[in-house]
Amino acid sequence: MTIPEDLRYTKDHEWIKLLEDGSTALVGITDFAQHELGDIVFVELKSAGTVLKQHEVFGTVEAVKTVADLFAPVAGELLELNALLDSAEIVNQDPYNDGWLVKMKVASPEAVHALLDAEAYRQLTGE
């Protein structure tokens, strides 16, 4: 499993990456999560403009065998949904790059830094 060092992680297996402006971030599911879910066939997300609290559900990922909720890693506003998700298998193929789910304006960049780093996430997953 791939666990990039430059991301932060949640216990719910989402990742977040602050962009260069320091207040906008990309969010997706981890390689571990996509592997556990299996073949992803559909992703449903709340619309851009939705304001989320930390841990609030912002969508679902539907795989062949199950449906999993997606939880906001931090509070903020959804700015953009990944247009490539029309082909949901992109999440399986490239969860950390082309398979990102949403771009969000984070309410507190400090909250991102408080999430799990790569080493802590490795320990959580046993990888």
From Swiss-Prot:
Keywords: Lipoyl. Pfam families: GCV_H. Residues 24-105 form the Lipoyl-binding domain. PROSITE patterns: BIOTINYL_LIPOYL, LIPOYL. GO terms for biological process: glycine decarboxylation via glycine cleavage system. Its cofactor is (R)-lipoate. InterPro entries: 2-oxoA_DH_lipoyl-BS (IPR003016), Biotin_lipoyl (IPR000089), GCV_H (IPR002930), GCV_H/Fam206 (IPR033753), GCV_H_sub (IPR017453), Single_hybrid_motif (IPR011053). One of its GO terms (cellular component) is glycine cleavage complex. Binds 1 lipoyl cofactor covalently. The modification N6-lipoyllysine is found at K65. The glycine cleavage system is composed of four proteins: P, T, L and H. The glycine cleavage system catalyzes the degradation of glycine. The H protein shuttles the methylamine group of glycine from the P protein to the T protein. Belongs to the GcvH family. PANTHER family: GLYCINE CLEAVAGE SYSTEM H PROTEIN, GLYCINE CLEAVAGE SYSTEM H PROTEIN-RELATED. This is Glycine cleavage system H protein. It comes from Pelodictyon phaeoclathratiforme (strain DSM 5477 / BU-1). The gene is gcvH.
